Amino acid sequence: MSDFYQDFNKRRTFAIISHPDAGKTTVTEKLLLFGGAIQLAGTVKGRKADRHATSDWMEMEKERGISITTSVMQFIHNQHVINLLDTPGHEDFSEDTYRTLTAVDSALMVIDVAKGVEERTVKLMEVCRLRDTPIMTFINKLDREGREPIDLLDEVESVLGIQCAPITWPVGMGKRFKGIYHRYQDIIYLYQQGSNAKKVEAMQIKGLDNPQLDELIGDSADELREEIELVKGASHEFNLEAYLAGKMTPVYFGSAINNFGIKELLDDFVEYAPGPQPRATQERVVSPHEETFSGFVFKIQANMDPKHRDRIAFVRVCSGSYKKGMKLNHLRIGKEVQISNALTFMAGDRSHTELALAGDIIGLHNHGTIRIGDTFTQGEHLKFTGIPNFAPELFRLVRLRDPLKSKALLKGLIELSEEGATQVFRPLNSNQLILGAVGILQFDVVAHRLKHEYKVDCIYESVNIACARWVYSEDDKAMSEFRTKAYDYLALDGGDMLMYLAPTKVNLTMAEERYPKIKFCATREH
C-alpha cells in the first residue's frame, strides 16, 4: 500500500454543488476519468443511453436521468486520495444534500456559463456558509454561447457574497472558444473537442506574449491579452487563507463534456483544498490528528444492492483509523460492536476495506439499529453536532391497495425514512400513516421503492397539514397538559419523537402563543 494512502493529510473530501443541469454529473464523471477511477466516462447526454453515468446507480435514477442519492466515490490523483460525495442536483433533494455537506471539508460549485447563479446554488451556498466551507468554482459549458465571464464573476460576488479570484480565463466561447489561459502558470491550453469518454492532453503554449499564440489563434490572441489586463485590474488575486476561510473562491473555466479544463481544476484542487478538518462535538472539538477512532453517520441508504436486501450507514471518519475487525462503541445505544466488513465505495461497486483514515467515508451494514447522526468511537463518550433534520414541508396520507400489507407498509416507510429524505408520522388519534417530505419528487421515489423493494402498492391522498414542528418542554406538567389538549394534532415520527401537525400556519402561531412553555422546532439535531 502506498505511503500517501496511509497519511490522512493526503485526503481531500468534497462535494459538488450546483443547480440542476449545470453539468454536475458530467463534471463528476470527468473528475473520475482524470483521476483514473473509470476508463470510459458514461456521458449523461442520452438519458436512456446504454451507458449510465457511474454515479447515478439507483434504478429510478437510471430511468429519469437525475442523481437521487448521494453516492460516494474514491479515487487517487497526484498522490492524494480523493473522496467525492455526489449530491443530488435535482431541486427537490434538500435534506440529503444538506447533510452531505456536513460530511465534507470543501465543495466545488459548478455554474452554467449561460445561466449564471441559479436559485438552487444560492440555497446550497447558504449551507456551506454556516460552516465556512472552502469553495472552488467551475464555470462549465464554454463550448456554448454564454454570458461574459466578467459579468458572471460580478454576479457570484454580489449574489453569493464571496470574492472571486479567476485562476483560468477563457479564450472566447461557443464557436469561437479557443482554450483557457492559466493566469498563475502563464500557460494557454488550446481547446480541442475531447472525444467524450477519453482523456486528451491539451496542447500548451507557454507565455501570453509567445508569437506562436498569434499564429495559432489569430486575432483572439490580442483580445485575450487585453482581457487579461482588464481582469488584473477588476478582480481579486488568489489568497489561500481567504479561500480556506470560505471568503474567496478560485474560479476555473472549461467544458466538462469535452474533458476540457477539468485537469487544471483537479491539479489545483489537490494542492489547495483542505485535508480533514477538526469537528465539533457536544463535549469538545475532535482533531483529525487524534489516534483513537471517531466518526458520525450522515446518511443511510436502504437496498443499495437489490441482490442483498441491505441498508448501509455512511460514516465520515473524523479521527484515528478504521482497521478491519476493530471494536467500536455505538454510543446512542450504548453497545460495543465489532466491525469486520466496512465498505468503501466506487458508486455502487463495493469493496471491503482494510483501512480508512480521517476524511474517508466507510459504509457499515445496518440492520435497523443505526440512525443518522449516530456517533461511533473507541470508547470516549462524544456526540458530533451540526447534523440537521428538517421538518417536512409537504404531506400525503398513505393508503394501501391491499389492506393485508399494512405491516410491510409500515416497515418500508420507517426503513426509507431512516435514510432521511422523507419522514413518516403516526397520528396519536388514528391508525393512519402520513408521509412528509421536503421536496415533491420524494413521494414518487417512495412509491416506486415501496413497490420494487417491499412489494407494497400504495396510493397517496391529500391531507390537511400545512406544517409540522417537533415539540419539547422542560416542564413535564406543561407537556402533559399540552398532550391532552392538543391530542388531535399530535403524531409520532419514525424515531418516536413527538410532533405537532398544524392544519394551517395560523393554527401553529396560535398554538405557540397558547402554550408558551412548549418549544415548537422546525429543525432538530439528529
UniProtKB/Swiss-Prot annotation:
Tell me which GO cellular component terms the UniProt record holds.
cytosol
Task: Report keywords, A-Z.
Answer: Cytoplasm, GTP-binding, Nucleotide-binding, Protein biosynthesis
Q: Name one GO molecular function term.
A: GTP binding
One GO-annotated biological process of the protein: regulation of translational termination
Record's subcellular location? Cytoplasm
Q: The tr-type G domain covers which part of the protein?
A: 9-277
Q: Which PROSITE patterns match?
A: G_TR_1, G_TR_2
Top-level taxon of the source organism: Bacteria
Where does the protein principally reside? cytoplasm
Q: What CDD domains does this protein map onto? A: RF3, RF3_II, RF3_III
Name the positions where GTP binds: 18-25, 86-90, 140-143
Question: What does this protein do, in the record's words?
Answer: Increases the formation of ribosomal termination complexes and stimulates activities of RF-1 and RF-2. It binds guanine nucleotides and has strong preference for UGA stop codons. It may interact directly with the ribosome. The stimulation of RF-1 and RF-2 is significantly reduced by GTP and GDP, but not by GMP.
UniProt cross-references to NCBIfam families, sorted A to Z: prfC, PRK00741.1, small_GTP
Q: Which family does it belong to?
A: Belongs to the TRAFAC class translation factor GTPase superfamily. Classic translation factor GTPase family. PrfC subfamily.
Q: What is the name attached to this protein's record? A: Peptide chain release factor 3
Organism field = Legionella pneumophila subsp. pneumophila (strain Philadelphia 1 / ATCC 33152 / DSM 7513)
